[in-house]
Amino acid sequence: MPMPTFASPPRIEALKIRNYRALRDVSFTNLRPMTVLLGPNGSGKSTVFDVFAFLSESFSSGLRKAWDRRGRFKELRSRGAEGPIEFELRYRERRNDPIITYHLSVDETPRGPVVAAEWLQWRRGASGKPFRFLDFREGRGEVITGDAPDAQDRRVKEELDSQEALAVNALGQLAKHPRVAALRRFITGWSLSYLTADHTRAVPEAGPQEHLSQTGDNLANVIQFLREQHEDLLKEILDKLRQRVPRMDRVDADVMGDGRLLLLLKDAPFDKPILAKWASDGTLKMLAYLVALYDPAPPALMGLEEPENHLHPKLLYELAEECREASAHSQLIVTTHSPFFLNALRQEEVWVLNRDARGYTEAFRAAELMGIPEHMGAGAKLGQLWMEGFFGVGDPTSPDLRPLKPRKDGHAR
């Protein structure tokens, strides 16, 4: 099924994290449209995933709420670390636009979290020097207005009403700060999925909804929306589902007399459909993933955590390929343990995570690790190498604290 085409979305090209739980000092560079995080249990994959969730929640619900629900500094700051928690994103708004760097440092006082530093920086032209067009500390700072801020432009001093307020979130609501507004839209538009089969069985209030929720508990609402607004797309999604669940005949969302919405699935041999609560976990998970990946108005960034759960191993190669297709319009961040999912991936798309002897996460691209490019060049698949121990980590039957072994010829291509 061909993916719909969209304008070039914003892309994160690099991410640096300091002092966030096990991520004491981790950098991801030259990120691809699809980035897959691989590693043993407890290596930090879900923590990287949560960094995106933390930033998105901080923008959409407020820093304090995101901070408090994760246990504040006591639980968030890396054990034995000092100083603020820091995040730094390097991204482009469109494919050929200048790189913009967004830096956020969060500290804590007895009254709660404070934004210790927050700035935006870019460089105009190939020979220009980087300069900050937004620079705030503890609620006070300067910003340059306009669509193309320049180092010579006038800086306007601003003061926010709280030291925990994010300047990008506040100023990004004003039309006179289009670059700041673009970042705010980008981050608040991220979609981080923690899909579970149980949640997809929910019986929600009737009413069409455009996008799948984090847990998938509005799957019936999205099916209703697609049926009403994108009937051809829904037909294609269900055709895909039938290829994986051959006896599946149709999927419906029917409104009950009390205003709730029932998700119904019908097997071909039978006359009557069954309620979603009686459908298999794998069928519901596959339907939810297809609905998310073929969203008619896709998010700029989508996260999927361990999509292999409840799915037959032979379905994972195709699912990985569909994720890559979807990455043409949504940057994808995926965590996995599955060798079957890995077999469809390129070594440049996969980052291997491991905890060192101090307990902190280290991360290298698969293409940076000793021996991996050579084995791939000889025809091996990443999943095979993962299962046979060529990454040096990840075997739960023989755990150790050996560090990952990067190549000596520098970083990945």
Task: Give, region by region, the residue ranges found by the protein language model.
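C-terminal lobe/lid and adjacent interdomain/linker elements of RecA-like ASCE P-loop ATPase modules
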Residues: P2-A7, A320-R413
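Phosphate-binding P-loop
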Residues: V26-R32, Y294-A297
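Conserved catalytic network of the ASCE P-loop NTPase/AAA+ motor domain
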Residues: R79-E82, R95, L293-A297, R324-A328, ...
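Electropositive, glycine-dotted interaction segments
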Residues: R94-D239
